[in-house]
Amino acid sequence: MEIDFNRIAVKVGSNVLTRRDGTLDVTRMSALVDQIAELHKAGIEIILVSSGAVASGRSEVRPTKKLDSVDQRQLFSAVGQAKLINRYYELFREHGIPVGQVLTMKENFSTRRHYLNQKNCMTVMLENGVIPIVNENDTISVSELMFTDNDELSGLIASMMDAQALIILSNIDGIYNGSPADPESQVIREIEQGKDLSSYIQTSKSSFGRGGMLTKTNIARKVADEGITVIIANGKRDNILVKIMNNEELNYTRFIPSPEPVSSIKKWIAHSEGFAKGELHINHCATELLFSDKAVSILPVGITDVIGEFEKDDIVRIIDFGGKPIGVGKANCDSSQARETMGKHGKNPVVHYDLSLLQI
């Protein structure tokens, strides 16, 4: 293996795993498992984030009455996940590789304790040669707390597990500099930090999934900013994973990772904006200090308002003097104490500078 990654996360999209009628493409699944098994036997730790449960279930059961979107997802995923994981179990067993099912929810990433509990579980699996197969637990997720799609979930998993690379497998070769349907368009091979891609990205989503290229790009940027290589490639290309790891010449998009290391807790905070329990509104002076070159904590004297109820260690949004969200941070106290000390000098920080991220 020419690319020196010891641990990778691989996300397989619904359009890779399903045929047009929604049934599982077992031939494609088998080919992907063969590739993952080859990498696993070469000593690479792999976490598989697999879509396909809802699409799989959709082809197995027909509702007796009209269901809303959440009820449909719960029904189809309950049936489809059993079918999906059973197929993975059988395919990996042919290679003598044990797998473990990890069903998670967005809520499980909202507190540091739950976050670390999940990380520990999957770390133990990897240490014992087990490949974790991760999916969202759609059967008990509610619409407002669902992941945008499994691209978002895979980004969280790659970050949480300190993966060196996240490979997102879709049904196109990567990000194009025009419409993928245009024969003149070409795949953008490398994307550096800060490169504007807005003119290239189409907002359409897949037939069986919730995600589109815009979501993939946003997740890829965030994960690459944490020092993790992100690759978007075509999961229907023969032996794509092995070819990527062998650094063979082929079309895919690679997001160049930041060279700066990011701490585990900052990785968690970077993905936690959607879990914020409250808001800290700060004045003009505090806002300017936060964006200066100095490492500055959020002190009570700079806080003008505390919105919502939160406990110590919860994630809170940081709102500037104009009402614009500028970041998130880990609260150093609960909301009652924050209100009590608000505007006062000589008090402990409400958010320490090490535990905040601006302009996420």
Positions of PLM-derived features:
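C-terminal catalytic "cap/lid" subdomain
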Residues: 1-65, 70-98, 102-360
